[in-house]
Amino acid sequence: MNTNEQKFESLAVTQVEVSVFQQGAYLGKLRGFATIILNGQLQIRGLRIMDSENGLYVGYPTDPYCREDFQHMVLPMTRELREHIENCVLEKYQQAIG
């Protein structure tokens, strides 16, 4: 292992900030934005809190310069991490809306 490398067995959400939007037709299914910090070391901004017929979910930031398709800039590579992030963000969202 290179001296500049450090292995992390798992990532954990250590902080969540949520901005809740007032519902309105102009926002569509968007309910808010979230910023998370992983392991106190990596910040990810621009997570979208979305509503669908199956309930709330977290959408990941996309590249605004990609014209044809949505290109995600950040994606969890395991189901466990995706579920962990979604649970933390949606729990904080539910607390914020009371």
Where are the predicted features?
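Single-stranded nucleic acid-binding surfaces, predominantly the OB-fold ssDNA-binding core
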Residues: 1-98
